[in-house]
Amino acid sequence: SSAASDVYKRQANGWFGPTTRKNLRQQPALRQGSSGTWVFLAQIGLRFNGHRTVSLSGKFDGDIVREVQNFQRRAALHVSGLCDYTTWCEIIASNGDTDRVLKGLDTNVFITASEAKQMRAAGYTHVGRYLVGPGQKYIRAQEFKNISDAGLRLFPIYQRSNDSLESMSYSLGYEQGLEALVRGRVLGLPFGAVIYFAVDFDPVGDEISGPVAAYFKGVKSALESVPSSRSYRAGVYGTRNVCGVLRSLGLVH
């Protein structure tokens, strides 16, 4: 998209950086009736994001409108059917439009009752806290009440390191799955809740289907080593690609 947005080809480096974002923001939104290179790029992007039946016609017809709406719905964006700046960013990069209004956040510090209320007043609905970690990183029992009383929903995150392929294996997944199970029980996390295990780096291809998948097989085995009525379900906290592959393998909810 860099080359198509008046960035000279010698400047196009494959990075979706500030120059590309600036040029992309100046492009008019694609809508039904649009045609040309930008539509073709949008169609390729939708295919890359799992919309395999999208045509590569370069024409923004009713079928493309519906595919864009489905993509926006899945990405929790405003459903307009327009391929606007925010939608473009979501198609191209996992972090999407970094200036968009968000509904969720995560933090590695204790959330007071006052802070929880401020988060809710700011429009947040979900907050992520860590089950393990040094210092204030891990959640305390009192925070459950602070979060709940403010009308927020908690999504629990498990992360020891989980930041490289070396930290991804079946044995580590099993060990950490058991730790998450114990930690959830100690904190009083409702049984059946999803614990989101972090993949804090950007693996691709065989790295996801290999070591990362092996780690989550270990996590799943650990959580399923006790009756489901006394356990939790595995989720993943990572890039869109990682989440999609692991879900397609049946390893996460």
Question: Where in the sequence are the language-model features?
Answer:
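Substrate-binding cleft of extracellular glycoside hydrolase catalytic domains
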Residues: G135-P211
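Active-site beta-loop-alpha junctions enriched in small/polar residues
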Residues: T107-F110, L131-P134, Q159-N162, D200-D202, ...
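Short, small-residue-biased leader/transition segments that mark boundaries at the very start
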Residues: A3-Y8
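Surface-exposed substrate-engagement region within the catalytic domains
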Residues: V182-L189, D202-H253
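Feature responds to low-complexity, polar/acidic, surface-exposed segments characteristic
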Residues: A12-Q32
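Structural recognition of the beta-strand scaffold that forms the well-ordered cores
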Residues: W38, G45, L102-D106, T125-Y130, ...
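Boundary/entry segment of secreted carbohydrate-active catalytic domains
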Residues: A29, S34, R74-A75, S80-A122, ...
